[in-house]
Amino acid sequence: MALPALGLDPWSLLGLFLFQLLQLLLPTTTAGGGGQGPMPRVRYYAGDERRALSFFHQKGLQDFDTLLLSGDGNTLYVGAREAILALDIQDPGVPRLKNMIPWPASDRKKSECAFKKKSNETQCFNFIRVLVSYNVTHLYTCGTFAFSPACTFIELQDSYLLPISEDKVMEGKGQSPFDPAHKHTAVLVDGMLYSGTMNNFLGSEPILMRTLGSQPVLKTDNFLRWLHHDASFVAAIPSTQVVYFFFEETASEFDFFERLHTSRVARVCKNDVGGEKLLQKKWTTFLKAQLLCTQPGQLPFNVIRHAVLLPADSPTAPHIYAVFTSQWQVGGTRSSAVCAFSLLDIERVFKGKYKELNKETSRWTTYRGPETNPRPGSCSVGPSSDKALTFMKDHFLMDEQVVGTPLLVKSGVEYTRLAVETAQGLDGHSHLVMYLGTTTGSLHKAVVSGDSSAHLVEEIQLFPDPEPVRNLQLAPTQGAVFVGFSGGVWRVPRANCSVYESCVDCVLARDPHCAWDPESRTCCLLSAPNLNSWKQDMERGNPEWACASGPMSRSLRPQSRPQIIKEVLAVPNSILELPCPHLSALASYYWSHGPAAVPEASSTVYNGSLLLIVQDGVGGLYQCWATENGFSYPVISYWVDSQDQTLALDPELAGIPREHVKVPLTRVSGGAALAAQQSYWPHFVTVTVLFALVLSGALIILVASPLRALRARGKVQGCETLRPGEKAPLSREQHLQSPKECRTSASDVDADNNCLGTEVA
């Protein structure tokens, strides 16, 4: 075909050829994958202006690990390294520092810490590990105090912190860990502190302890090995008569070829006073059971990271939600799960059978002997008999497991902390909302509606560089989640409704805090559940039902008119880039040209954008469509006009607002680029290098055959190669012999350059 028939000059034809080659090299854009489990529908990277966050930090302070919300929800108390802060969080935006009191470890304790081979730069400080509200006028706090735990009371005055008096500092052994790296937990119940931590400098003696209050101080018996020496505590949750401790430790009841971690729940009674003769100053009601969080066909999630209690509307059905990971990696990545445990199931297991250790076989088996009344380990009133206490010393492990319900399973991520709440939707139902911190500094918002599995509404990357989320504190009255980490505290509004610009996008988000307001045509924060005109569908995320005034087909495409059309004036023989914002990671995207698909010969899709060679007949309406949950809707619409030929706007699009925009435009003829917002020079270099390699390969092949023939002639015309015997060093007995001549022509040489029918002279 002649060049004029294509309507292109030679340079434009070369540009078209390179564009087609570029189309083959560019990766195909697909809707995200990213491992097993639900994907976050919207991702916000650090510094994304679409997600407004507030950051508090204080010069000279770090390790903002401990968070406590005041009773009125207006003040956030923060335990940092060697300081305690009071932050006013009533107003939106950055929390305001009300006041701060220092509580450093003494110089003597720091010297002793360094003498014991601990680091002066990272360890020999006072890391605040316990911060609880003792009453309306005092807080109670404990810290590592340079590997010498200490505790004290802090007086409050109008929610301001008063300075700590050194003479009121008490020993904190058993309440705070020695090592800031060790996990711990503590909860204040009826004026008594229940704590789980390490009780020695080496970190080899875990302990569950009760201090403060009028009841006697009680603790676990380390000699009886109720806890494995590597027990790691993550949560303490009070109930009506008991306090539950959640932790993980090495399992001793299983025969396994490697050290097997297991998650546990332990229980002690609030009215426990210890034994009179046996188990003096020790728990007499300590029991523990295995927690099981697993999904069929997968390895168990056997390492618990955090647990919280969500009281239900009915006091008979509260649940505990816990975050788990696995000690094993699958495919080089770790996985996480959130499981729900009914308190009724936990109580039932603790009322079941015991395990006992067979001393002859060293195996744990089910105890089948008689039971006494009252039942050993029960929260009965009055002292226990010596027989019951003797039984409790060896029968502290329950036979049955507490099986949880997996709500969220996700690979490629490790969750560290969890905060939960319920949100009432427009349908009047309560939906579980979970906020999950990760080891890489992300915050996930997950929602569970009814019996359906969890879906991830959003993922927020909090830090430019990955680091773990250390603590989460939900402030319902402020509508925010506070995130503690090494450098400060983030304030994260729990919903970001304004990012959803259409009714379809708002409904598909399935965020119980957001609903579409038809009057203002905005996605708004749901302030009251009785807004009948607002639109929301939490169960199905069905925009067909929520966003249409009348009956609609399954696809929204025929009835979807763009809210605005962006007009683009293009130059002939140029590459035009039409961007398409990917509003949802769950959607698949495609382009249309009017009622038809875009022409494949002159276009390609790269990173969601449409790259289009402007030629005759390519003008008109271009729309980027998203398909999600079975529904298609336009994300963005362009009307492309050429400088040489202006098209009349489709009458069906009359009345739609239009906006003239400039998009990346690159000329493929001999001229320079017209709009160099995005350079395709790297792609051009790639294509050029590949073309040069192909050309070089062809030249090598063409030159190789003559060279081979020349080499064969030179070998035949020269001397015969030495025989193996002639290659050995000459001895005295050997005599030099002249080489024998090959009398043959080049045609008498085989493929290996051997003489054929050679006559030897």
Swiss-Prot record:
Residues 36-494 form the Sema domain. CDD domains: Sema_4A (cd11256). Disulfide bonds join C113-C124, C142-C151, C269-C379, C293-C339, C497-C514, C506-C523, C580-C624. Residues 573-631 form the Ig-like C2-type domain. Residues 722-749 are annotated as: Disordered. Keywords: Adaptive immunity, Angiogenesis, Cell membrane, Cone-rod dystrophy, Developmental protein, Differentiation, Disease variant, Disulfide bond, Glycoprotein, Immunity, Immunoglobulin domain, Membrane, Neurogenesis, Retinitis pigmentosa, Signal, Transmembrane, Transmembrane helix. It is linked to Retinitis pigmentosa 35: A retinal dystrophy belonging to the group of pigmentary retinopathies. Retinitis pigmentosa is characterized by retinal pigment deposits visible on fundus examination and primary loss of rod photoreceptor cells followed by secondary loss of cone photoreceptors. Patients typically have night vision blindness and loss of midperipheral visual field. As their condition progresses, they lose their far peripheral visual field and eventually central vision as well. Cone-rod dystrophy 10: An inherited retinal dystrophy characterized by retinal pigment deposits visible on fundus examination, predominantly in the macular region, and initial loss of cone photoreceptors followed by rod degeneration. This leads to decreased visual acuity and sensitivity in the central visual field, followed by loss of peripheral vision. Severe loss of vision occurs earlier than in retinitis pigmentosa, due to cone photoreceptors degenerating at a higher rate than rod photoreceptors. This is Semaphorin-4A. It comes from Homo sapiens. The lineage of its organism: Eukaryota, Metazoa, Chordata, Craniata, Vertebrata.
